[in-house]
């Protein structure tokens, strides 16, 4: 019922928005609750309205908008250098012309497996003045606090919840969404770069045998495991499902003054893209 109400708010607001051309304000589709929980339905309704009236610009409200995958556009995508899957997309632009998304300094804070922007068959599009980040990274990491023959003891911060399932390590978020991993890479905690001569451990099963220690830490098990105590072990995401910007068959797209701090794939990927620049 709650999600239906959120979607209804966006549809009702469309009746209040401009009816032809000009600027459209996302605020007309939002209320305080949706901005703080899931602005996705409002964004979806606003973009649909913009396409229908051929608006020149969608202006975001500033501040922070939280966006979830629950009611986002669904689309199965094959994206070069990323992994195919059924995507959830926040800003889905198809066939739009001469259109701008003015972020107005807005921070878009995403939760879960969702792609921020997808543009298909679009021309003369500008996205400007916004920030993209995620509440949880797609990789996971923890500090190496002890080691031995064929094992490492890892202390994970609260940001990276984990448990043991069938004798193997599993990462999840507070809602239970699982974050698979497929490789381990040791990072120098001081220099904040891959450790000198670190081994890149690939995991064909997308997990690793593990056991929980009495102190709450996790001991991961593999014959050839080694690392320096005090360094950080990064558990790399198993797939690139959610690029920041996907541009397919587009012409003249400008991304200006955008801070992309994190995403679940490549930052910007262009397929069959042309530009006069």
What do these predicted regions represent?
Residues 2-12:
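Bacterial N-terminal signal peptides
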Residues 12-22:
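Bacterial Sec-dependent signal peptides at the C-terminal "C-region" and cleavage site
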Residues 26-58:
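Acidic Gly/Asp/Thr-rich repetitive segments characteristic of extracellular carbohydrate-active
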Residues 44-51, 66-100, 109-128, 136-157, ...:
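Extracellular beta-strand-rich solenoid/capping regions of secreted or surface-exposed proteins
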Residues 62-63:
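Tight coil/turn sites that cap or link beta-strands
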Residues 69-85, 91, 136-241:
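Acidic/polar low-complexity surface segments
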Residues 273-277:
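Conserved small/polar residues in nucleotide/adenosyl-binding loops
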């Amino acid at each position: 019922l709650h999600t239906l109400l959120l979607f209804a708010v966006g549809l009702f607001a469309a009746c209040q928005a401009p009816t032809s051309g000009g600027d459209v304000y996302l605020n007309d589709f939002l209320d305080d609750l949706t901005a703080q929980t899931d602005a996705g339905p409002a964004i979806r309704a606003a973009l649909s309205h913009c396409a229908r009236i051929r608006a020149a610009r969608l202006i975001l409200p500033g501040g922070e908008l939280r966006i979830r995958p629950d009611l986002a556009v669904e689309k199965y995508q094959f994206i070069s250098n990323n992994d195919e899957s059924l995507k959830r997309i926040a800003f889905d632009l198809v066939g739009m012309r001469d259109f701008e998304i003015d972020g107005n300094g807005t921070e878009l804070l995403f939760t879960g497996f969702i792609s921020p922007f997808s543009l298909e068959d679009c021309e003369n599009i500008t996205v400007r003045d916004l920030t993209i980040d995620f509440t949880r990274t797609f990789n996971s990491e923890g500090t190496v606090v002890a080691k031995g023959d064929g094992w490492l003891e890892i202390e994970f911060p609260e940001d990276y919840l984990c448990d043991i399932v069938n004798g193997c390590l599993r990462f999840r978020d507070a809602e239970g969404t699982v974050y698979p991993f497929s490789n381990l890479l040791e990072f120098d905690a001081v220099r904040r770069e891959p450790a000198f001569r670190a081994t890149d451990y690939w995991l064909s099963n997308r997990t690793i045998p593990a056991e929980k220690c009495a102190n709450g830490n996790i001991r991961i098990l593999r014959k050839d495991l080694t690392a320096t105590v005090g360094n950080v072990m990064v558990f790399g995401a198993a797939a690139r499902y959610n690029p920041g910007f996907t541009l397919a068959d587009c012409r003249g797209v400008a991304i200006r003054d955008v801070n992309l701090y994190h995403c679940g794939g490549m930052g910007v990927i262009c397929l069959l893209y042309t530009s006069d620049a």
